[in-house]
Amino acid sequence: KPKRAAGPRVSRRTFALGAVGAAVVMGLGGVRYLPSRTLLRPPGGQDEEQLVRGCLHCEKCREVCPKHAIAPAHLEDGILNARTPRMDFKSGWCDFCENEPGGPKCVAACPTHALVCTDPASVIIGKAVLNRDWCLAAKGMGCHECVDVCNYDALELGADNVPVVNVGACNGCGACEWACISLSAGSISAGATDRAIVIRPTEEVEA
């Protein structure tokens, strides 16, 4: 039987920080105190309990992400979520390291297997949601940046030339959110507080 490949080595300082974090978690009664806010996780982090229990906050997953799409969660995301990895589609998107041998680099870099991904093609990070009130295409500007970058046939232009999301085909890669230029349109998108198309947790979209 082949041996399981060893993960990256963890420094004493990182291990100590992780141990302190784990102690806090257990002192608070564990994952039942997870906040209600759901975060978008990297590939292999969709098992929330496994991720929170195993994450050492070492940020190795963030460091190796070739698309710069991973960021540490903040305290306002919840005390147990703080410094765990979340997706940041304002900075990049996830291609699941499709051209990298061995699958997602974030998964390979995780020293505790808090991220586990055996089949990247089956991973659903989230689902795209379009706000027509902020969409440049809906304002007659002819924008279709999000449609152009989608590699999964999850976006198409509707009869009115406004993007339509095929929720079933969307895996939440975030390319559409990263490419959206609505917030840079000045007065055209006045009042907008986010990009016109964003990725939301699956349960929020399909509820």
Enumerate the language-model features and the residues they cover.
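Non-ligating segments of multi-cofactor redox enzymes
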Residues: 1-207
